[in-house]
Design a protein with these regions (language model features):
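Conserved alpha/beta enzyme-core scaffold
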Residues: 1-239
Length: 239
């Protein structure tokens, strides 16, 4: 099966529809599928529920989909960098399901592994546990969390071969493997595509069995979320 598509728009064609549950990889602005997010915005699909570690920032990442009102609900761990998100949420225009970061990762991992639910202590005694099953194990209370099974996963990897085997780069790996494994359909944006067999086995972080479509974007912007620099240190003794 041919997995490589000539554009992000074509990679989404026939797969993404109104009202779907989507999962998007990344951590902050690191490791996000920029071209796929732009193509999703341009497709005009509406009423999306989006699973992601965060909601992007104003004008970039998932923030673009918030500006066009294509997201009706977010399932996320952190949303503090996006003023438009704040405005929509406080105006009751956007639904939000907060999920602790580790729990979110495990819900996605469980979905990809075929595990329907699991128990965790995280969130017990807080609003996170409201309406969920609680159970005692060895004198400790745990809350049951259900797996996440997105209709479509949008993923960013560094490199792929023609068969869809993926290699991630440094911290851009983050949530992407779990997001890829959980999706019923997985679409991946990469910076380089190589021939099948040219990658060493130990370079492959995720096997191509999880990947359905690939698009190459060799020059993503990779915007820095917050630039921090160290002040120049002067040697007062030698001055």
């Amino acid at each position: 099966m041919k997995k490589l598509f000539p554009s992000a728009a074509q990679a989404l064609e026939g797969v993404v529809r109104d009202g779907q549950l989507l999962a998007v990889g990344g951590f902050g602005l690191c490791g996000i599928p920029e071209a796929l997010i732009d193509a999703l915005r341009d497709s005009g699909v509406q009423n999306l529920t989006v699973i992601s570690n965060n909601a992007g920032v104003d004008g970039f990442g998932l923030g673009k989909l918030l500006e066009t009102r294509q997201i009706k609900k977010m399932i996320a761990s952190y949303v503090g960098e996006n003023k438009e998100f704040e405005r929509q949420y406080l105006a009751d225009e956007l639904a939000l399901e907060f999920t602790p970061q580790g729990t979110l990762a495990e819900k996605l991992r469980a979905g990809g592994a075929g595990i329907p639910a699991f128990f965790t202590k995280t969130g017990v005694g807080t609003m996170v546990a409201e309406g969920k099953e609680l159970r005692d194990f060895d004198g400790e209370t745990y809350v049951m969390e259900r797996a996440l099974l997105p209709d479509v996963s949008l993923v960013k990897a560094w490199r792929a071969d023609q068969s869809g085997n993926l290699q991630f780069r440094l911290t851009a790996r983050n949530f992407n493997p779990a997001v890829a494994m959980a999706g019923k359909v997985c679409i991946v944006e990469v910076e380089e595509v190589v021939e099948t067999g040219s990658m060493e086995p130990d370079q492959i972080h995720l096997p191509g069995i999880y990947v359905h479509r690939i698009v190459c974007n060799p020059t993503p912007e990779k915007r820095i979320e917050k630039r921090t620099i160290t002040e120049k240190i002067t040697d007062k003794a030698g001055a």
